[in-house]
């Protein structure tokens, strides 16, 4: 077991991949709890698709793909916030419209450019094993910035989630809190997309948080548990993919393996809590 854990870390690319997925797991766990509290799961889906045209345009002009993703991702949440403040427009409808429009623009851009197929595959499924030092530093900066931002306004965000009327009565700027959370969610999704791809990035945010909600009702505990599950689940997933490929000649997609591990943890937690609830109910009846 010791060799199974340590052996992959001897390869430089695996060390970078493990650090990347641990950072993303920590970030996703912290942000994901607030996403679940505010029921913003669909927002993560919208963001992961609205960054598509930004990445495509950046590729077409030879610019940084991260910059393109940041511009369109943050622009989408700002536009969404502006639309949501209009009472005549339903928030879900606004997200659906942005989802369709940004994705369509991305498809149009891609259809006009050649040589994008390989990068499109990486965009969809990620390249966690190809993470370089620069990307690792960028992810670390995003993770630290987002976690610090959440920590500063954690109490306000929790109050906003459970009692928006009370938060407004106490003078908290709800619009600014919503905007801050939306931007943090966008940054977390964008950071995950580069390593995990648009298909899998959201799982790093939603799955650990959903698991933590099964295990505790306290928001602070949920954030700690979700961050731990995200980081360890990512590490274990990469180790399993490495071991299967190197020692058993079975090729497993690293990003997908990470998601499978996180989902297995969620399933185990769901079963365990269900059994525990039934046992306690029977004891109460007896």
Annotate each language-model stretch with its function:
Residues 6, 244, 251-286:
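Cytosolic-side transmembrane-helix boundaries in multi-pass membrane proteins
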Residues 20-29, 50, 54, 58, ...:
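Alpha-helical transmembrane segments in multi-pass membrane proteins
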Residues 4-14, 87, 91-155, 183:
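Transmembrane helix-bundle core of multi-pass membrane transporters
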Residues 1-26, 285:
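Membrane-interfacial amphipathic/re-entrant helices at transmembrane-helix boundaries
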Residues 24, 136-208:
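Helix-loop-helix "hairpin" substructures at the membrane interface of multi-pass membrane proteins
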Residues 14-23, 39-48, 66-71, 81-97, 136-141, 171-177, ...:
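Hydrophobic alpha-helical transmembrane segments
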Residues 33-116, 212-227, 240, 244-251, ...:
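Short loop segments and helix-boundary regions at transmembrane helix junctions
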């Amino acid at each position: 077991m010791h060799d199974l854990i340590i052996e992959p870390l001897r390869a430089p690319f695996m060390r970078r991949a493990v650090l990347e997925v641990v950072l993303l797991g920590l970030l996703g766990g912290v942000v994901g709890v607030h996403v679940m509290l505010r029921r913003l799961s669909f927002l993560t889906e919208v963001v992961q698709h609205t960054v598509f045209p930004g990445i495509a345009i950046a590729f077409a002009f030879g610019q940084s793909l991260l910059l393109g993703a940041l511009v369109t991702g943050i622009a989408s949440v700002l536009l969404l916030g502006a639309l949501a403040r209009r009472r005549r427009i339903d928030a879900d409808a606004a997200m659906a419209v942005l989802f369709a429009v940004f994705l369509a623009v991305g498809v149009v851009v891609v259809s006009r450019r050649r040589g994008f197929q390989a990068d499109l595959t990486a965009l969809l499924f990620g390249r966690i094993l190809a993470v370089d030092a620069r990307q690792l530093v960028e992810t670390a900066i995003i993770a630290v910035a987002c976690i610090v931002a959440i920590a500063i306004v954690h109490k306000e965000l929790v109050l906003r989630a459970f009692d928006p009327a009370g938060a407004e009565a106490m003078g908290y700027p709800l619009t600014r809190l919503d905007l801050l959370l939306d931007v943090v969610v966008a940054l977390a999704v964008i950071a995950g997309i580069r390593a995990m791809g648009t298909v899998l990035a959201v799982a790093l945010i939603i799955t650990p948080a959903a698991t933590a909600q099964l295990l505790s009702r306290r928001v602070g505990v949920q954030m700690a548990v979700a961050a731990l599950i995200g980081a360890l689940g990512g590490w274990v997933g990469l180790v399993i993919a490495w071991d299967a490929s190197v020692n058993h000649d079975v090729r497993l997609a690293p990003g997908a393996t990470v998601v499978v591990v996180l989902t297995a943890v969620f399933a185990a937690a769901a079963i365990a809590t269900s059994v525990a609830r039934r046992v306690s109910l029977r004891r109460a009846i007896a």
